[in-house]
Regions:
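Mixed-charge (acidic/basic) macromolecular-recognition segments
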Residues: 2-3, 12-52, 142-144, 152-285, ...
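Aromatic- and glycine-enriched beta-alpha-beta binding-site module
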Residues: 103-172, 317-386
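Generic structural motif recognizing short loop/turn segments at the entrances and edges of beta-strands
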Residues: 67-75, 82, 97-102, 114, ...
Length: 480
């Protein structure tokens, strides 16, 4: 007698996904696409309130979680790091377990951009983590299970994060701490239906070839609710994205990968033209990025409390002591990168024959696995360019934009687990033919939001800054 295959945790752990079976074990084919899924997310984005937690009560819930747990971050000298040390031969900053991450040196040579050669510290974290959001329908509307999570680098410490935000070292408990809540929904296929699962890059200026799984899983059955978690509609998250420093970077990158409706169905450039242009951009840029010992990085000064560029630009490497009662481990020390100044990140937008378009930039960052990813029109930190005569294209259009042209503006922090007080001002700015012609300069192309979200079904097409801005579109925080 033939029996239908079953999905087990062991099967999934081995990397095998059984074929769906029909009666008497016959193989059953299914539709390759769930055409209803984008509409379900759109309905959630159009729902600004929930019976689980009113949007106006989110701030109070976050305050209550802050009061419940002890959160504190103090700068410390490198000598007070517990479990971290500078290797004697390389100077690399490493953890005694060999896990988590290391701070090493990077030598870069490129054929484009204002800098053609440079050296810098870089975070090497080869482990692939999980950034995952559990979703479930209540009263016909998808809700997202979001977490109030403390990260030491966040300016306000506590922000709203995905259901699961964990490195492999964390969820395999290299820190010997508590289990990661709700992890099984992302490691055991019997617990839910995968809606999105794709590798995406982290900050290419500060990470060396770092990727995380960005996942959305629809839960099967009841989901127990912990006090540090709440169900929110996508529309509620969109409203919170209009506020400064509420939704963290990891939540934003996952939300950008959510299925998105193609309302117009047309674009200035076909999908094939977009892919061909992007492939040519990757092919024409030569980037050599080589890891070197941290103690061989020229132009950087070592102190007891920080490693700084000799001109005071870019970022510093610092150390911190952390207390966080709600985390898997309640206290630890770690290195952090601290950028110099507030960044600015913006998409120029135009309606072309009625269809909204964004001006994407094929951006080179030394830490990318594939040299180039699509970024916003402008991605800029003023102090990094203060000494240069060359300024980013379209920068003045953004800086001098009339307030009536600014469709969206908010300050969001970057990855608070590795970066201290790293913030950027994110904008959508309307442009016209004078500001940004349809015939874009080399390295730029007009694309629709839907074309970008389609690319997010695949690895390493859009950088994390572009994904933050796309999350504002998928959630309804801004409508073009």
């Amino acid at each position: 007698m033939t029996t239908a295959p079953t999905t087990t945790a062991a099967t999934i752990a081995a990397g095998s996904v059984p074929a769906p079976a029909g009666p008497a074990g016959a193989v059953r084919l299914r539709s390759r696409l769930d055409r209803e899924l984008p509409h379900r997310f759109a309905r959630s984005a159009a729902t600004p309130e929930s019976s689980h937690l009113r949007t106006e009560d989110v701030a109070g819930w976050l305050d209550e979680r802050r009061a419940t747990h002890r959160f504190q971050v103090d700068r410390i000298p490198f000598a007070e790091l517990d479990g971290w040390s500078f290797q004697q031969d390389t100077g690399n900053l490493v953890h005694r377990s060999g896990r988590f991450f290391t701070v090493e040196g990077l030598r870069v040579a490129t054929t484009s951009g204002p800098y053609r050669q440079w050296h810098q510290p870089i975070i090497k974290q080869p482990e692939v983590g999980i950034l995952g959001i559990v979703v479930k329908e209540f009263d016909g509307v998808l809700h997202l299970l979001m977490q109030a999570k403390m990260e030491p680098g966040n300016p306000n410490l506590l922000q709203i994060s995905p259901t699961v935000q964990a490195t492999r070292s964390n969820y395999t408990k290299a820190h010997r701490g508590a289990d990661v809540r709700y992890l099984d929904y992302f490691t055991d296929r019997s617990r839910g239906r995968v809606l999105t699962d794709v590798l995406q890059s982290e900050h290419g200026a500060w990470f060396y070839r770092k990727s995380n799984r960005n996942m959305i899983v629809e839960a099967l059955g009841e989901v127990p609710l912990h006090e540090d978690f709440r169900w929110l509609t996508l529309g509620q998250v969109g409203e919170l994205l209009r506020r400064d420093n509420v939704i963290n970077m990891d939540a934003r990158t996952v939300l950008a990968c959510a299925p998105f409706s193609d309302a117009e169905g047309v674009a200035l450039h076909s999908d094939t033209e977009l892919l061909s242009w992007f492939t040519s951009e990757r092919a024409r840029h030569d980037v050599e990025a080589e890891l070197i010992p941290l103690n061989q990085v020229p132009g950087w000064r070592w102190g007891e409390r920080s490693i700084d560029h000799e001109d005071g630009r870019y970022f510093s490497v610092v150390a911190a002591s952390v207390q966080a009662g709600s985390r898997e481990v309640s206290g630890w020390t770690q290195p952090l990168f601290e950028p110099k100044g507030l960044g600015m990140t913006a998409f120029l937008t135009r309606r072309i024959d009625g269809a909204p378009h964004l001006l994407a930039h094929a951006r080179v960052e030394a830490g990318f696995k594939d040299t180039v990813e699509l970024g916003p029109t402008v991605q800029y930190t003023p102090s990094n360019y203060a000494h240069l005569t060359e300024r980013p294209l379209f920068l003045d259009t953004v800086l001098n934009a009339d307030p009536s042209r600014i469709r969206y503006e908010a300050v969001h922090s970057e990855e608070g687990g590795r970066f201290l007080n790293a913030e950027s001002r994110y904008l959508f700015v309307d442009a016209d033919e004078t500001d940004a012609p349809l015939q874009a300069p080399p390295g730029y192309l007009w694309v629709t939001p839907y074309q970008l979200t389609r690319l997010l079904r695949h690895n390493h097409y859009l950088n994390v800054q572009a994904r933050t801005l796309l999350s504002c579109l998928t959630s309804g925080a801004v409508r073009l």
